[in-house]
Amino acid sequence: MPENSKLRQKVDPLTFKITAANHVLTNIAKKLPKNIAEKNNLELHVQEFLFFASGAIEVIKREINSRFEIFDKENVFYIYGLKKRLLDDGIQGKIKETISNYFSTPEYNYELDTKNSSLWRLQTLRNQAMHGNIIKIIRNKLHFKYTIRADKERVIIFVESTENPYRYFKQLFDELCNFIIKTKKIMNPNYKIKIKPLQI
């Protein structure tokens, strides 16, 4: 059996997903691409990162569901639906609040509020990547476009830009790790974090 296959059998799915996301994150450039080859390379590594990072969310989402038996394990469900079905008190209430602190849709009330939306943005980028390329460079900056519905009549599009792709996705990765740690510790106060470098 190849050495990589042996390694993957030794770690739990969540640890593997988050470790893989961290591994491919290091391949994301810290500068904007200068030519089409570098742009394609950046697209590749960003999509790899989003794949594994979203996979980690999928794993912990199903761990939460298994703990509280909210949905049938065979059903397809989203973290927003899970949050809606969680109770407002006790351990479920704490997990519900933690989900809200990371997955809330940005709110617009004269000003845009995205402070509780880091993993909403991550999942939005993953959805965009499933339907096409997401690397768009405009005026020497990398642009990411997000769409929200402000009310029944207004749709708001906002853009985040960066000159350092690695830093942008490192911030999302850090938020993902924080969410995982907080959620796991709510369910198991003795949980020992396993996010560390592994050979992949």
Task: Report each predicted region and the residues it spans.
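Acidic, Ser/Thr/Gly/Pro-rich intrinsically disordered interaction regions
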Residues: M1-H23, N27-F51, V59-I200
